[in-house]
């Protein structure tokens, strides 16, 4: 299962990554972004695919 993490606070991003990797070893973290703009760009890049997106609800740009 491919996972994208969208979080603008780097420590929170790292913590979520660590928790997911420890508890769900079959998850493949395919990317992490820090803004709405960078997330849209990531999603529109050919070849990028996420089955699940963990997204901060209070991003600075959206």
Q: At which residue positions do the language-model features occur?
A:
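Acidic, metal-coordinating helix/loop segments flanking the phosphotransfer/catalytic sites
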Residues: 17, 32-52
């Amino acid at each position: 299962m491919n996972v994208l993490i969208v979080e603008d606070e780097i420590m929170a991003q790292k913590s979520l990554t660590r928790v997911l990797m420890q508890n769900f070893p079959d998850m493949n973290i395919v990317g992490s972004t820090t803004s709405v703009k960078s997330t849209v760009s990531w999603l529109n890049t050919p070849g990028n695919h996420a089955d699940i997106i963990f997204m901060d609800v209070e991003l600075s740009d959206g």
